[in-house]
């Protein structure tokens, strides 16, 4: 319920609810139909599970939205609601206010609608009547009292299909009421966009169709789909059974109708739950009605509302919530708890998740465009309307998801990517993540049947694609991401939206339009928004996405029939061809692909058939629909026409409205004509066959062709599609962004978010492409991250596109690979990775082969905790992401190859000494993406693993993943997740970024890896172990994950590698030792392995090969050979994973050993393996090194410039600079590729040092982060921003930006936004004393002393705020009581809960609570060994105390040992124990005193000579210590649950100092985030033991895990994902509603605030995710409810991969990474995390 009310909040981002609602809104606005379809299915699979997962998605999306929405709070709603009758209601931008208007409209039409509504709910045809629909839409408000109470629920459950409008209104209103309905029903509804649908029903059903604009409608639809589709799918049975089935049947009086209530989708879906095949007329009829089109969102809302109890939209929202609770019963209890908090509660969450896959995935939609199909819009970040602002807002979110904060899309994208990806991953975990939309049980399992847009009910309902697609699919295709959901915007719902489809169409069209709107708003064709920016903005449907808005109008008579027939036809017969094609396609690349393609193909074909007129039709009307000029296309698309068509649309009479709604309503029973058939048959199969057409349609992700089939079929040209400025770059960008199979959304997202940097927009492209959308998430995973299976057309399309476009690389994958995942990944790599890799690191900026992207993407994906693994593995058994593709396969070698691709591999030849990752985890409250304040530097070159760990989150950005993905995904996803070097190695995949990796990679990788890593140390384990178990949870993956993460991960491998091994000899150590022992000054210094001891790659390779059979292979270009197996997606992926595991283990070990100058020898190797994940060595090191290269610089250089300087230089010079200004300066004058040159240049010549090479992705990331961070953060005087203020505020903090490069490059002064003028420099704050100190020294110093406190270290436990001057709050709160930590000893850490990540943390934090605790204990011993190995990884875990506690496993990481849920380490604040805001580093080896002395010495100036945190002499460049520079360490977070972002220094596996983990907590409850502080967490390789370390501390637990972030959000109990969003949101919120989290039932998870699905609020889990159980948390079954993870599988959230998951994730991943990044495996990863909010 809160969903909607917060909608407005969301719009304004005023409240948590807002965020959540925002998320919902995202969902609602999201092109829910397609996403709904897909997402619903996915979500539906396990309602609760999804809830848990989606919460993440939702959270993330919300976060993204939240971040992006604040600037345009109104717009998203507007977009969604576009209620203004005068304006095209499809114009989301106008919806916010119009929304209210719409609400009024709702009120107005209700009378008429009332009659119809009441009747319609059951009579689909009646609802079909536009008037009825409209009225119904409106009716809910009016009818609510009458109809809602008695039949609202029933109607909502039944009405949505027949009485779609009521459902719509009810749902939307309900949605509104939940959030704002009760408080402000009128405004709320309008804000909720639900009203938009309802209020402006009069205006037109487009609201439903415009669900995208008015996300709530999509949400409802989505929900409906989710509810219906989900219900109708296994998820429906599973999740919705809990929710709808239990709640609805009971509340609704019947699930069947309840499904109907879902806008017919529900009905249609509803039967599926009971019996997937049953796509009974009841379901069909309801869905078909035009009202359902508008209803889809309402349906979603209905579902939502149903979940809420179906109370009246306005008033019954809450009441309904209760009612829903009663009705929902099981689901309601937990869900309601959440719902209560969220207003939507679990149901909503679920809906959100279900819908969130699309909606949540596109959840940014609300913020992005506040509208636009949630998915579509979100995808594009809906940057058009709100997205634009989102771009600004996305800053933080960007980091989060994509770490691309620059573009609104980023936040949106990443979150969404994470969300959808997560959701997809979750769904995949549920067996169908591949296509978020095509996740019906039928589709879900097969993932083909349901088709992408087949959405939830896909498989279950209507042969999966038959009815599903039409009804849901149609709608999904059209509105949600359903089919071609990604492209949904491109004439997705053409033929598929028929009647029910109309609803779908409306939803699709409007939702898509709305989604498009996010883009469309900018482009005129908002309604058509689904098309990604309107072909021509004016073209109604705007096939910006390479799709043409094909509005096939259905004969008026048929309209009624449509309700019954079209729906059935669409479902069963109308689009038999389309359906068949869809199915066929589903059979091809994947269910999703088929569905996607079909819907979109049908639409495309139809559009094509109709001709440009149809596509471009005047005012968006397709030529064929001249009579319907007022139709949604025109109205929706032609924003300009909005006003006139708007009323016509809504007010023009139900008829018109219905028509508008019906996107491509072909006479029912009549197959879509040739084009559709052709398109479907050809497009459908072709996509699978990689036919050129697909290429054209899909546009290979290049700017060549809008990869939207529809686009191509429609003949929409790139110029046509993306040309319209409204959707900046929708055309070209869209085209390129569209990439594979995700074109529309991705393109839209890319275009929207990347509009500014559309050509790849330094970060925009990266972010946009990276997170283009929910589908995009999926697609994006496969695409951008190169981890997902591109089940939707993405895969096939990608394949086709590659083939068509002759993309050799793609061709390589495509050529018989046809393994959607791998192929998709490959293509994705090129497209997505290309987007990401290209943009980010891969091939230079965006250009060049994208293979790199794959690895990076993989790593990123894994790191991001994307559903990549969940997605990839689940999505495609072939863990394309897992081993194939990302990482090992590095699809296309992209990952590893990426590394070797020179860019990546070359970059990371040796263990990077310093990984500089600039991650701007800015969660600007304002929502403006400021410059990223996050700069991650891993001085110490923790093994690439660690760097990867760091990068994992950035992985996609930094192809370090590419080795980052390669690294993290070393084995593709597995790489990240498994070998992932990043994943496992860096713990990123395995843990840390691995979290996501494990979640993502963890899933597949986890699965294999789990076995493997379990055995092999579960590189994946640490982060993903729990994630695996939690994230993957119950799934095969889950099993994998847990061991991996929980036991192998952090504990075993990480620790197994030996406290000394990894920690001692880990990459960090190895590097350090190498350095120390002169393994190669230069190479050793930054070059990653190659520089290692100057042994060149050859040496390293030899060593690597010798040590890790896959080091080179697994890590190398083939890297995926084992991991991804270029040709064998599944087996290769698995094999790769295994190989990667073995190779990674060996390779990593070797890497650690060798890369570490072999200093670690076995230990190093082990550590390396652990840290680097065999792949890391190859791709890992290469990628990681590559990534690491980013951050790694010669120790000397580091010394010279200081860690941060190196980091900045690296990030800036390499990435940021290159991306921004070109790496010439820093990198030696040229692009990313020349790692060595760069490195030499940067490190040697320029002294950028530390920057062996910054992946373009990383650079982009940094750049974007820096550029996208909240300005507030970076503003001078902010205390965080460079400038005197910062310096002053942070007496000791010096902005590394002082690094000459930064300064010069930026032209800013040394301390100012030197980095790429993005203020990166501003972002990097290094204690002045540390400025010139080598990374280790810096880390030590940072650890040893309070950053601002001067040499003297505060007493341990004394976190004496140096004076929270400036926004930063406690500028030097980071009191690293080095001694204190040691004093705390292992136990201390555990007290801190570092145990969590760090202690239990290592796997503990990550692992299930129990495991966590155990792990913690395990690590505890490790912690005990700080001095030994684990100790070596002293890391600051921001939020060290926080007491992750909650998650014994995840929580274990945390909070006070977090063994106890949340209280383990002192309860929620357990971690707080470390003293909020107190940053203390434990000197691992040296013990507290020694460490303190060393740290103090280092800080005091002895840094170079000072002891490292370990207490042993610091070795320049040795990143053993964690330098956590917290811009501010207030109690902030602590207040919330444990405290603020505390920098917890987890030393030792257990993060023994964990308790003492220095936690810098911002004074404000919000914590750093709240404070907008920058937290520079530099976890040096000192966190080698996978256990401790930020990752251990917080990664798994999310940002604050176990102290990890001290106050970081405690890991979600469910997903273990520390949701900064949640945490951040919760920070203040818990303060406001202290009991919120704590009181949340375990399953419910913290409510609005914590992970929604956090199984337990994590001890109240600091909000955020607090709560999720480790497994659940990461995933597994429930969606993480984390605000950031919401709706996403927490898997990522576990998902250490911050990427899309959420900035928090990023931070968490980063934090986690360093420590447990590799699950404790990537000790050598130093994170310089500047967490700025």
Curated annotation (Swiss-Prot):
Residues 179-189, 202-220, 272-299 have a biased composition (Pro residues). Residues 336-354 have a biased composition (Acidic residues). Residues 77-97, 135-147, 355-364, 1078-1087, 1100-1112 have a biased composition (Basic and acidic residues). Residues 365-374, 454-466, 479-494, 882-892, 993-1004, 1027-1043, 1116-1127, 1385-1407, 1454-1474, 1652-1665 have a biased composition (Gly residues). It comes from Suid herpesvirus 1 (strain Kaplan) (SuHV-1). Residues 21-31, 316-326, 1408-1420, 1444-1453 have a biased composition (Basic residues). It comes from the Viruses. Residues 227-240 have a biased composition (Polar residues). Transmembrane segments: none annotated. Residues 1-41, 71-394, 437-506, 520-548, 882-907, 993-1141, 1223-1242, 1348-1475, 1585-1608, 1630-1665 are annotated as: Disordered. Residues 113-131, 190-201, 495-506, 893-907 have a biased composition (Low complexity). This is Probable nuclear antigen.
